[in-house]
Structure formats: C-alpha cells, structure tokens
Amino acid sequence: MRFRTYKNTDLTVSEVGFGLWTISTGWWGNFTEGEAIALMHKAFDLGMTLFDAADTYGNGLSEELIAKAFPNQRDEIVIATKVGYDFVHHGEARGRGQREIPQDFSPEAVTRATDAALKRLKTDRIDLLQLHNIRMEQVYDDALWKTLEKLKSEGKVRYYGIALGPAIGWLYEGVNCIRERELTSVQHIYNMLEQHPGHAFHDAATKAGKETMFLIRVTHSSGMLEGKYTPETKFPPTDHRSHRPRSWLLNGIKKVEQLRFLENAERTLGQAALQWLLADDRVASTLPNIYDEQQLVEFAKAPDTVPLTSDDMAKIEELYSDNFCVEEEPPKFKGTMELPQETAVA
C-alpha cells in the first residue's frame, strides 16, 4: 500500500480506502455484522487506513461498524464520515431505494449530528467531517462554515470538506464551494467512464489556486470497470444495479471492451481503473466499492501495480472524447441539484 498526505495538513491516508457504503446500506446486497467486520479487518491488514462512513448509511450502522471493528486501533486508522441528512426523523422513509430524505444543515443540527457520530464511533475526534450533498444555499451559509470551524477548534473535527453523490450532478455546488471555501477534501464520483463533473472540480481547484484534494468514489462505475459483466449478468433484487436500464449494462460492456488494452499479466482492468485515478496528484485516495475478499485484495494491490503510461492516458482521453465509439443518448446532468418536494415533507 502507498499513502498520500492532504496538502497543508498532517492527514495521511492510504491510496485505496474502504468505503462502508457497500456493507451498511443494503444496496449492494446484505452483509451480516460478522461479514462486514471481517472485510474491514482484512482491509486493515492489507494496509488500508482510511475508512469512510456516513451517519445516514444504514441509519448510523456504518459508524457503529468502525467502532466495533477497531476498538483498539484508533490512532492507526483515519475516520471520515458525513452529516447533513436528517435520518433520525426520516430514516425509515428511505426504504430500499436511493431516494433522498430531508436535510438539515443548521448549525444546531450539524453540531448535534457530529456529537451523535462521535458517540457511535466511540471516539473523541473525527479526522475528516464531510457535508453530505450540500445545495447552493449551504455553499453561501456563513453560519454553517463557522460551525465547522468551531467544531474544529473544539477538537471534535480535525479537517472538513464536502461529499457529493451518488447521483451525478452537483456541478455548480461543487465548483462554487471549491472556489468560495477552504476545503481540505471533496469526495465525488469519478472514473474512466464518468468524468463529468469530477474533471470540472479538479480544474476549479487548480484555477482557484486551492490546495483542496479529492476522495474518489464509484471508481469502477458501479462495477463496470472491473471488466466482469456480460450481457447475461443479473443483479439480485436488493442490489441497486438491478434498477438500472438494460442499456446501461449493454453499452457499458461495449465501452469496457475498448479499455481491454490496459490489462496485462501484471495488472487487471480493475487495478488499471485505480491507477488512472492515482495518476492525478490531486487525488488523495480512492474508495472502490468493496463487497468480497477477492475484490478487496485486488484493489488493495492496485497502487503497487505498473502505472499507466502517458500513451495509455492519452488513449483513454481519446476514447472518452468519442464516447468509446458507442452511440447512445447523451446523459442528462443536473448542474444544480434540488431536493424533490415530495421528499422534503416531514
């Protein structure tokens, strides 16, 4: 495993981290507590030190899993979590889907959520607190950012940032927040197949002269870039991918075939997908979706595989600019996200 340090901080993270999204939400299949903790222990043994949770993942479950998995290793791991969704009052309304629930970014709610997360994590500090899917209103809410500074001064939070996704959007929220605020970290979707709006976030930080670095989620385009899907692939009903249109699967397979040149005897396509991300020094860490031990080992070894060449990078850029030679309707991205009215009612 290799490590990177966020600029102007003492926050060092493994280049491949462990996102608890897959083992705590039920959207990637169901895991027993024992199965989830076993994967986390294996990740730690493989050198992963960054564990990324959210208070809304499993209505607090992801944070509780960290506390149970690492009761005696607090100084050896980096804990990142997220606040912003009012799951205390609306968690049961979400059901199995990816439906959003109401948010509350008031200073009181953020403070309360942070204190609750600390209790679930059984720790005295959160290494990286992320505002979960902020809207434009929060970008310009000075009271919110003063609250984060207060939490930092109290020692409850070491560093803070924002986390955007899983829906692809939040372009202007992300870009404006990077420009207007001093963020240690921005977590967002980014991979060889889905480069928007992530590329815009990275460019915004560079152009604004900001030291913000990035945590990358959905590194393999919901498993597509692992290169294992076929037209016959079927997902269980509890898996969120079962709700995607069939065109997503068929067109994705066609795109992946154009990337097979990245595979070789020393590197899988899944590892190449992580190497593509790590070629950008603005990326602090990657958070692949992990749901079995074989995959965990493959991803953990990715930083030590052969890096992509400049020719590889240029070829990927060329393919992306031509949509990987696949004809399909262009995706409809939302530049500014809005919480649907029907989910905003208590």
Indicate residue ranges for each PLM-predicted region.
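N-terminal binding-site loop/beta-alpha segment at the start of enzyme catalytic domains
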Residues: 1-78
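Conserved, mostly hydrophobic/aromatic
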Residues: 6, 18, 36, 51, ...
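Acidic (Asp/Glu)-rich catalytic clusters
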Residues: 8-10, 68-75, 118-122, 149-152, ...
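N-terminal small/glycine-rich loop or linker at the start of catalytic domains
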Residues: 9-27, 80-100, 128
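Short, acidic/polar
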Residues: 30-43, 103-121, 168-177
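Alpha-helix N-cap and loop-to-helix initiation/capping positions
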Residues: 31-35, 65, 98-109, 136-143, ...
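Active-site groove signature of glycoside hydrolases
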Residues: 118-137
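Beta/alpha (TIM)-barrel catalytic core signal, keyed to glycine-rich beta->alpha loops juxtaposed to Asp/Glu
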Residues: 134-319, 323, 333-346
